[in-house]
Amino acid sequence: MEGRYNVKMFIAATIAASVSLAPVLAADDEPAKRLDEAAAVLSEVMSAPDKGIPLDLLEKAHCIVIVPGLKTAAFGVGGKYGKGYLSCRREGNRGWSAPATVRIEGGSVGFQIGGSSTDMVMLVMSERGSSKLLDSKFTLGVEGSVAAGPVGRTATAQTDVQMRADILSWSRSQGLFAGVALEGATLRQDLDDNDTLYGKRLANRHIVTKGVKAPAAAARLLALLNGFSAKERTD
């Protein structure tokens, strides 16, 4: 009788432990899940004929930032919060670096409807912008100029403002994809998410510049980046 009681207690304890661990495991999966979402955003906005990011701009970019599912606070209020990834060109233009995590806060995008979820993509077009981006904190429009990016097959219709900008940015919300200047938003590295992905609290600059091996979850995103870059070179 006592043995049967002990077995029941063991089973109950095991179930309780697995339930208590579920939120932790789910939280650990979030950065990997977000990488998949970032890859989906990149695939969709780069594949849209005449309505996406020009391939020649991606080819010239030093870094890219993708934030899937950026949340907007309320109608008429510009506050936003979201998490995403950045990747930069490897030295010698040999593909793209392992992704580093970012959080974006604040800023304003005028046409957004409050409470909506928005996908953001940014291309960093200058060395100055890419260097600042890898700091622990980076404010758009303050530490690097930002402009709404052009939409289309090529960037031949770029304005002077776009050509001079350190960063070009785009937004997709409720099916609408357009260039948008995300002034005042702050990008911060997320050491906790880096720890989850890499097993160490690595700084973004270290991940990008020291040849850190990308996690398996980043394979699709990096394959897309390399593929779209190669397409521009061969078209």
List where the protein language model places each region.
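Short linear motifs centered on Gly/Pro in flexible linkers and helix caps
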Residues: M1-E2, V24
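Bacterial N-terminal signal peptides
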Residues: A12-L21
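Bacterial N-terminal signal peptides that target proteins for export
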Residues: E2-A12
